[in-house]
Amino acid sequence: MAALLVIFLGAACLLAARSPAAEIDLATLSCDKYENEIVGSPDGGQTSSDPVPKGPVAAPAAPPRPDAINTVMWLFGFSVAKAGEHVMYGEALASFGFALDAECRNEPGATLLHAVTSVRPNRDKPMDLSALNCGTFESRHADSVRTDPDSARTIMMWLFGYAVGLSGSHVFDPDGVERFAAGLKAECASNPNDSLFDVLSALSRPGKR
């Protein structure tokens, strides 16, 4: 879908003021709805610059969509966890997005969970999470938050998706990333010499550390 290419190339332009977004259950959301309602273009509804309509008052607006690029990043992290891997592929986001798009086009009625766990994107430039010191990661991430907050957030969304994939859940809560980031920061502060993979595993299974 051409819209995905625009999303990947213009990610910074897509980050807007955030409002509470609805949770997404990958086991019940169809590929078709994902393509059209989550990452697809808006359906041409009225904008703030349009004249105020006359007639009956419109129904309350639906919950806003989660940010598209961050959604794809979350799904990418989730899929890597589900595949049993512990690496982050630094240049494979576009490959994952296009592979997911193709899978959903081929099986529009399939669940998003099925599609996400079926795609096999390129495995370019892997970074082993089990070899990355958690304290080192948190220090780098803090620098990134100061210098490039949008990129820092997308990386955190990948890690959030990865942790949810490890936990066995299949629900994406777009507004849960801040809580997750705070928990990760606290764990890294308490266990700076542990690997990022070990800390993510602990976060995904509270009480099992």
Role assignments for model-derived ranges:
Residues 3-14:
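Bacterial N-terminal signal peptides
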